Amino acid sequence: LDHVLKTGSPDLRTRMLQEVAGLFLEDAHRLGARHVEVFDDILIRLTESVELRTLTTLSRSLADLHLVPRELARRLANHDDADVAAPILRRCECIPESDLIDIAWMRAEGHLGAIAGRKAVSQELTDILLMRGDSSVLRVLASNPGADMTSAGLAMMVDAAERDEGM
């Protein structure tokens, strides 16, 4: 692994990432926590030197798994590029609420829209999205039956809807 990371071409690093990710995806359902940690370490190192489209593909392939390498999922969810982050933010149920809250406070609309589209969105997250999101984020949130709203959040949504005919 060290040799490939230091001297391997970008294509070789990408192929190695794809192969290791493929092994993980193939066996994820029967791996124990320690094995997942090993995959996490290896995959993180491999993702540090590959193209965005490879990271986006990896994010899409991991998003629906019940057991995802924790640090890798965290890094993908918080990636600068919303296309990389969105599959994990929208569909991965393994991302802790605290991470989602941090991301909702720090990131822009692409990330916020993905969080707004989750199957379940807590009241705290909903309030953050209502405070920080643009109209496209609020539309996603308004159409999400899994978004739990406080009374203050509902009032913010009504105010936003009065200003936005599309909502």
Regions found by a protein language model. Name each.
Residues L1-M167:
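Alpha-helical scaffold segments
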